[in-house]
Amino acid sequence: MDLLKSPLYSKYIESNAKLVNFAGWEMPISFSGLINEHESVRTSAGFFDISHMGVISLRGINPKEYIQKFFPTNLYSFSEGQGLYTLMLNEKGGIIDDLIIYDLGQQEEDISEIFLIVNASRYQTDFSWIKNNLNTNNISISNAKKDKVLFALQGKNSFKLFEEWIKSSISHIPYFGCEYKIFKHISSKEKIFFSKTGYTGENGLEILLSAKAAINLWDFLVSKNIKPCGLGARDTLRLEAGMHLYGQDLNETTTPYEAGLGWLVHLENNHDFFGREFLEKQSRFGINKKLVGLNIEGRAIGRKGCEVFKDGENIGTITSGSWSPTKQKAIAFAYIQNSYATLNNVVEILIRGKTFKGTITKRAFYKKDI
């Protein structure tokens, strides 16, 4: 089976990228090297092609009313021009996907539009789940990305670089805010979507635009000595920032409370949603396992599947792990028995047949300077 390719694939080849199969897409794992790319984002800026991710459009009269049942978070807690990080759940409260939902407001008379930016591996599942359970003809659902590019510009210099490219200020847009508009010097017809969001723990933007405009932006950034970055750096950046990766830290058998995402469950809102009954019970009676952060002694990396012990008892499993270029230590996420999930508790981690000490910590290993 042929791998899917981004419209920017030719730029990968031109830039000597190392390519891998990621969720059925041929994507760059690195360009100039993971550490180099990671540090560029932390100190200045870097950019990523994230076109493997999905963009679902929902259009109609008041689409929030019809799609609220898919999300445990109150969709009326954010308004036009804003985004919201949330979860889509199954009937048992398991996480189908974690995603960002954007309110684009009214696009034509009485017709409003919502964008969902979803994980690459979950696009078909998400699309089918919504389509099969909408139960209304008042909302249309479609692929908003098609042959477009999803582009991420991340780092403390990202805003001023983007402003220079669009020749317009974005200072009025808040964190998680978005716009969908035409910039005439780029294209007299194309509407470009962008949001102040990211997956790195830094200031950043995620941008949906045509291949032609994306190549223009790529070349502009390279001319400013900004590096293209691959999925390797994206993974170490997100792990340092305490952000989940679907398929490793989240899946359909984990719930928001277990994943440390209970703040996204608005039971007090009294709206009905898939999984509500199960989560009400879990909220009342507690959880058996919990996702925690781990600082690991030495330089051994605890990868997905490594077992966690306490006094010889197996208490959990690592889901994500890497070396932290910023903190210069091994870090990881692990699901462990809730009774052991206390900060500063020392545990043992089995890595390639050897035992290493680990200390339970908060999941955010890094926070940017304000």
Swiss-Prot record:
Any single Pfam family the record assigns to this protein: GCV_T_C
Main enzyme class: transferase
Membrane spanning stretches: none
Catalytic activity: N(6)-[(R)-S(8)-aminomethyldihydrolipoyl]-L-lysyl-[protein] + (6S)-5,6,7,8-tetrahydrofolate = N(6)-[(R)-dihydrolipoyl]-L-lysyl-[protein] + (6R)-5,10-methylene-5,6,7,8-tetrahydrofolate + NH4(+)
EC numbers for this chain: 2.1.2.10
Keyword Transferase: yes
GO MF annotations, alphabetized: aminomethyltransferase activity; transaminase activity
Keywords, ordered alphabetically: Aminotransferase, Transferase
GO cellular component, one term: cytosol
Coiled coil: none
Gene3D superfamilies: Aminomethyltransferase beta-barrel domains, Aminomethyltransferase fragment, Probable tRNA modification gtpase trme, domain 1
Any one GO biological process: glycine decarboxylation via glycine cleavage system
Known role: The glycine cleavage system catalyzes the degradation of glycine.
Entry's family note: Belongs to the GcvT family.
PANTHER family: AMINOMETHYLTRANSFERASE, AMINOMETHYLTRANSFERASE, MITOCHONDRIAL
Quaternary assembly: The glycine cleavage system is composed of four proteins: P, T, L and H.
UniProt name for this protein: Aminomethyltransferase
Gene source species: Prochlorococcus marinus subsp. pastoris (strain CCMP1986 / NIES-2087 / MED4)
